[in-house]
């Protein structure tokens, strides 16, 4: 770190922290990132993006805006880190019955869904995929290689002397009226983007971050030969060299990052209902998604400290939300543009205030 006053401290180097760092750098702001010694859940994420919640045939809020943004945002990061990290890939939703075929066609005909769902049922047969009722085509989908993104971005920050692997010690943060100070270094603002580690943050630990453990497998199969993202009971994401990511599980009680045999068995069982060829498991990953009770993000300013901010609650759609929320938070801080009430942490602080009246 330097002796000069920085614009931002950023605590956390997962998708949220890296996205906010990128937004700040795009605006010529000075930053320092505290990465910590625990791997973020983003490393174990599939990094898939799509606009439709298939279980209920609903659109993600601000879906098109988020898709448009990520298609510009991640290529900008690619230029910075000199790596390919974002890949467009159509999604084939396996249909399990005639009723599911009809539901998909009806949904695709609704005006809001026409940009994201195709009305034609795809009967292309992948030899090793069990699909007697065909597939529904989802458009504007793909994935970001989150592991490569986070590793490469961390290397970039390291080369520029603006990241530390140390775990942030909250007790050493000194809060002044117009800046914060940490171990002698000063910054105008501090952004906490710690994912599930927020549960240990004394400034925000009372917010309702629950955390949902997710596990996925990486398999190798020479005979699967699939070049789209398959979605059924599990998703199957081709990542090259006969390798595929398979996921993902949800566990609301286990808050460890350790892979479990039960999740592995569950994923393998689901996979065998989707494909008929041999495969081998080459990797098993686990992480805690930063999920919130109301399924909405946690973004905004601390109610008592005007230079302390939160960027969290990205949940299962971190690849889409990280750029979108980072720009929203940056504009809130720098230009005083209000945050939407659905993402602002004020929705919780206001409810606490109201209940105490």
Swiss-Prot record:
It is found in: Cytoplasm; Secreted, Cell wall. Its EC number is 1.4.3.3. D-serine binds at residue 289. Keywords: Cell wall, Cytoplasm, FAD, Flavoprotein, Oxidoreductase, Secreted. Optimum pH is 8. One of its GO terms (molecular function) is D-amino-acid oxidase activity. Optimum temperature is 37 degrees Celsius. The keyword Oxidoreductase applies. Its cofactor is FAD. FAD binds at residues 13-14, 42, 47, 289, 315, 318. It is an enzyme of class 1 (oxidoreductase). Its main location: cytoplasm. The keyword Methyltransferase does not apply. One of its GO terms (cellular component) is extracellular region. It catalyses: a D-alpha-amino acid + O2 + H2O = a 2-oxocarboxylate + H2O2 + NH4(+); D-phenylalanine + O2 + H2O = 3-phenylpyruvate + H2O2 + NH4(+); D-lysine + O2 + H2O = 6-amino-2-oxohexanoate + H2O2 + NH4(+); D-methionine + O2 + H2O = 4-methylsulfanyl-2-oxobutanoate + H2O2 + NH4(+). GO terms for biological process: amino acid catabolic process. SUPFAM superfamilies: FAD-linked reductases, C-terminal domain, Nucleotide-binding domain. D-proline binds at residue 289. Activated by manganese, copper, and iron ions. Inhibited by barium, aluminum, and zinc ions. It holds the Pfam family DAO. Catalyzes the oxidative deamination of D-amino acids with broad substrate specificity. Belongs to the DAMOX/DASOX family. This is D-amino-acid oxidase.
